[in-house]
């Protein structure tokens, strides 16, 4: 993982926690392409996130595409903090 991608993960997890979401790093347990994080709102609504290098430099593998298709609307690829904030506010209905 590149430094830029790790920094993005940390910043996005901080934002999620400020909104009261649990941020769970998913283990690489032999399932290739599994998303990086699971974000959970109280009550169970969940969003799987695959972080990609900021600036569009990250490549999506065939395995990552499989998981994106399998998880459907509860999966997103994120390459910016602003994009992440917008996604979680809309997905989890976090409007004030």
Tell me the role of every PLM-derived stretch:
Residues 1-96:
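Catalytic phosphate/metal-binding cores of nucleic-acid and nucleotide-processing enzymes, i.e., regions
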